[in-house]
């Protein structure tokens, strides 16, 4: 049985999920990576407000957390692709729900502003 009254991230499913959601760019990165293997420069183009250093850091963290895999091809120039890992694939349903909620929330905010 999960312990919902703990600070141990790996004992509480809410805290474990919160760690995935906590990175500023994690949700957007996972959204773009879920579409299929993607290269670093393509991610950087899609997220034009993120610096290369921050993108590198966030990708390393997602890889360390086991949510994405990094495949390096032995060629010149170097080619690296990122894709969702097996456990990262499980996060797809969460991303769909986030998108659904986000759309509803945007409409809610717009309707409140027009009142």
Describe the role of every protein-language-model region.
Residues 74-98:
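Basic, amphipathic "hinge/linker" alpha-helix immediately C-terminal to the N-terminal HTH DNA-binding motif
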Residues 2, 31, 89-115:
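Amphipathic alpha-helical dimerization/coiled-coil segments
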Residues 1-9:
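N-terminal intrinsically disordered/low-complexity leader segments
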Residues 61:
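Alpha-helical DNA-recognition elements
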Residues 58:
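Residues within the DNA-recognition helix of helix-turn-helix
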Residues 8-54, 75, 81, 112:
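N-terminal helix-turn-helix DNA-binding core of bacterial DNA-binding proteins
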């Amino acid at each position: 049985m999960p312990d919902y009254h703990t600070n141990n991230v790996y004992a509480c499913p809410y805290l474990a999920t919160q760690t995935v959601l906590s990175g500023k760019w994690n949700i957007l990165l996972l959204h773009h990576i879920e579409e299929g293997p993607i290269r670093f420069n393509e991610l950087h183009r899609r997220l034009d407000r993120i610096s290369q250093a921050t993108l590198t850091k966030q990708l390393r963290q997602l890889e360390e957390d086991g949510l994405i895999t990094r495949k390096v091809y032995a060629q010149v120039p170097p080619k690296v692709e990122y894709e969702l890992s097996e456990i990262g694939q499980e996060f797809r349903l969460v991303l769909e729900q986030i998108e659904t909620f986000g759309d509803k929330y945007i409409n809610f905010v717009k309707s409140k502003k027009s009142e």
